[in-house]
Structures are given as C-alpha cells and as structure tokens.
Amino acid sequence: MNQKHSEPFYISPRLFDNRRLKRRRCRWMERLLEHQRICMARMRDQVALASKTDRQLSHLQRRHVASTLQPDVTIDLLSDDDETPSAGQPAAAGHNRLLIPAPGHRAHRTGRRQAPRRAATHSYPVTDSILITSDDEHNEQEPSSTARVRSQLSMRSPPPLAPLTQSETIEEVTVSLVPRTSTTANCLTRVSGHPKPCRASTAASNGFATAEGGEGGNETGCFLEVDVGGGITATLPDETTVHTVIANRIYELSLSKLREGLAFSGVPEYTNDLMPEQLQKLSPALRAKVAPLVAPSPPTPISLKLSSDLSISLISDEDDCESTGPHVNGGVGTEPVHPVVVAAAEAHAAAKLLKQQQPQLSVVQHLQYVGGGLAAPVALALPVMAANPTSSASVVALPLQLPRRRKLG
C-alpha cells in the first residue's frame, strides 16, 4: 500500500486559541463584575441608611432635650443710675435655675430593627444670668411683665467737640458705614415685590438689625434707625446722608484742632476762645470788633483733607504750585501786595510755628492766591527761618519745595 504524506507543516499556537471559549469566559467575568458592583452598592446604601438613622436618633434626642427646657433666664438691664428693682434680694436670685440635658446612656441593641428610644433628661440647678449694659442715661424702666429685648445695632452719635483750651482731650469719632444692599430703596422694592416686609435676618447679614414693629401697621423694619441720644430716632433714606454726616464731622474736628493749635501758638486772631455759637449771641457791633476764627476764604477754592492720624493738609484745587510768571521770579516791589497774600503769609508762618511747637499736629499749607489784578496765580510759601537772610526779596521769591499732591475732587 502506497501511503502519501503531505508536505511538512508547523503546528501554530493559534490552533489552541478557542474564540468561543474566550467569549464565554468574558461573559461570565462581566456578569461576576456586575454582581460585585451591585453588592457593593447595597452595602454602601446600608451604611448610609444606618448613619442617617443614627443622625435622626441624635436629632430627635436633641429636639426632645430642647423641648423639655424651660425658659427660665434672667435678663438684667443695667444703666448708669443703678436702681434696684426690689429692696430685698436682687432679681437674679429668684431665677437661678437652668435645665441642662444630661447625656443619656444608649441601651444595647438586641435586634436589627428597634424603635428609637427617647433620651432621659435631668435638670440641675445652675446659677446663670445675662447682663445687658446700656449707655443711655435716660433709660426708662419697663415692667417685668412687658419687658421685651430688642436686638438692634444702632449707630452712636459722635461725642461733642472738646473746648479749645484743653489740648490733651482725645477726640473719638465713631464711623458707621451703611451698605448699599440695606438702603430704603432696596427695602421698598423688596416690599413691593413680596407681601412680607424686610426681616431682621436679611438686615443683620448686612451689618444692621432692623427694629421689630409694634402693633399691626407700625412697621418700621425697612428703615435704618440711628440713635442720636435723647430719645430722638432718625431714619436714613440713603448712605449719602451718612457719608455727609461723617464728612461734616471730620471737617469740624479738623477745624477745631487747627484753631486750637493756632491759638496755642500765639496767633492773635485765634487767641480768643469764642465759638461761633457765642459770636451769634453778641451784638453786631461787638461781633465786628471780634476777629474771625477762620481766615477769609481766598479766591481759589481750598480743599481740606484729614488723614487717619488727624494730620491736616490744605490742598489747592490747582495742580501746579509753582508759577512761571514774571511776578514770582521778578521783584516783589513791582506789584502791590494783596492783603489776602499778607494774611496767607501770616497764616503760613503760624502753621510753620505750630509744626515746630506741636509735632503731633502735621500741618502742611499749600496755597495758591491770586493777587490784585494778576492773571497768573502766585505761589506763596514763606519759610520761617531762612538759611542766608541776605535779602527778603530772595526769600519771598523762592517758593518752598512741597511734595506734589493730587486733587481731592
């Protein structure tokens, strides 16, 4: 028997690559992974449910403890004139009991599902009181049955001006800024859009607490209340009023400090301590004899700037302080000196003397005056002591080198 053999062949490893078996194995692996993901998700849900149940139980315990507390808190309103409400024992002695929850011991669970047990609370006598101090001298004592605490933040009016003779008196200014989100216009818009008025929580988040209305229609929650003393309550329609009041207050303080320093330095115009209110009480004849407290205003407007350390700077609205005209570089005797210029020179010399005597008051005078019939402004800066006093004309002609300042407007 003649047996034929084929040509030699090679066994490829791909013969053992069963594709159907591989696909079947991949399907089983996918099902196993899906089942594992489902089991893990169920376990996570069970853990979250258990923690949520614990949180609910603790929340119920806290609510139960809070509901069992009795509102037995003493509030004493203390004023400057301490008037005892009763001649016997004080009011705080009768209300010295406050309930404090004791930590309840949680019982061990016997089964998986168990009804939430209510925590046991115990009360302990604890002496506790809240003291609220008031700066108002005319504090009306309300009866204890109708005593009602209002949570309101009021802006205190600044203290009055100190007299000119006491230079060591410390001036204190309380500045309260009104945010734009709590103005009357926004409150009115909010009221017109919604039936309920502005609540105290919305205003308190902006830095103010509105006063609660009294009965029915007396709703003043949309207006900002300002405590100006003496039981007078004013409403601020906008923050511009507050900024104006602050600016006027700073201006009055700076003027009083300037007058006080000039009077202390020995300027004859400022030695008398007559205030504008006292000048108004005088007759016109005596008022004409008394020298004015403030120098006459020059033709060029002067701005008054007050920094944080009460340093006063008189800044002209004109940008250039050095004049290039021939009147400054030339002789002084060519043109007649204007009386306002003479007054400015005296004021400048007084300011420099004040700077030497009281270094804590930083007075910088940077003025521009228009002389009589002069088109160009005259930059006037007279140093108190000249290095080489050879000629007074050179001293007057050379202006003082002051740091350039920007406009305030």
Swiss-Prot record:
The keyword Phosphoprotein applies. The modification Phosphoserine is found at residues 86, 134. This is Protein a6. Residues 106-120 have a biased composition (Basic residues). Keywords: Phosphoprotein. Residues 142-155 have a biased composition (Polar residues). Residues 106-165 are annotated as: Disordered. Signal peptide: none annotated. The modification Phosphothreonine is found at residue 133. GO terms for biological process: embryonic development via the syncytial blastoderm.
